[in-house]
Amino acid sequence: MRSSSPSTGHSTQVPIKVQHRIAKKTTRRRRVDLPCGCSYFVALGCHNHGFTHRGTTHCSSIREWRVYLDGQKSPVFQDNQTPRETISEEPRHNHNTSPIQLQPEESVGDTQMFSNLPNLDSFTSSDLAFLKSI
C-alpha cells in the first residue's frame, strides 16, 4: 500500500530568504556569563531587569551587553565610565541564612485572647450544651 503523504525526497527546500525572515521574528537573546561560571540568556526587550543568584544581585543593563565584545577593551564601544559593581544582597528583615525557622516557645497559662474568659469550671450545663450545639 502506498503512503498518502508525500515523500521527503520530493519536498522542496525552504528558500534562504524565508529562513532569514523567520529567524528575524524569533526572540533575540544575548548570553551573559557570570563570574561564578554560570550563564543566562536575556531577551533584548528585557533589559534593566535584575535577579539574585547565589546572594548577588545582577542587573541586565544596556552597558552589560558590551560584555560579549570584551567590555572596555573593545574599540567599538569606548566610554570612560567606571563599571558598576554588582549590588550585594543587604540583610533585610526577612533575610535569614539559617534553613531552620525558629518557632515561638510554648508557654503555660492564659493567652491574650482568652484572658477575659471565665474559668471553664464555672460554666453551667446549659452553657456547655449551647457550646456543643455550635
Curated annotation (Swiss-Prot):
Zinc finger (unnamed): 36-53
Keyword Metal-binding part of the UniProt annotation: yes
Mutation effect (T52M): Produces local necrotic ringspots and systemic necrosis in N.benthamiana plants
BP GO terms, sorted: symbiont-mediated suppression of host innate immune response
UniProt PTM comment: Phosphorylated.
Keyword GTP-binding: no
Mutation effect (C38N): Loss of suppression of PTGS. Produces chlorosis and mosaic symptoms
Residue interval(s) of motif Nuclear localization signal: 17-31
Principal place of residence: host cell
One Gene Ontology CC term in the entry: viral capsid
Keywords assigned: Activator, DNA-binding, Host cytoplasm, Host nucleus, Host-virus interaction, Inhibition of host innate immune response by virus, Metal-binding, Phosphoprotein, Suppressor of RNA silencing, Viral immunoevasion, Zinc, Zinc-finger
Annotated region described as Disordered, given as residue ranges: 73-103
Stretches for region Transactivation: 119-134
Pfam families noted in UniProt: Gemini_AL2
Gene Ontology MF terms: DNA binding; structural molecule activity; zinc ion binding
Polar residues bias: start-end ranges: 75-85
Location within or outside the cell: Host nucleus; Host cytoplasm
Protein family (similarity comment): Belongs to the geminiviridae transcriptional activator protein family.
Subunit structure: Monomer. Homodimer. Homooligomer. Self-interaction correlates with nuclear localization and efficient activation of transcription. Monomers suppress local silencing by interacting with and inactivating host adenosine kinase 2 (ADK2) in the cytoplasm. Interacts with and inhibits host SNF1 kinase. Binds to ssDNA. May interact with host RPS27A.
Name of this protein: Transcriptional activator protein
Organism the protein comes from: Tomato yellow leaf curl China virus (TYLCCNV)
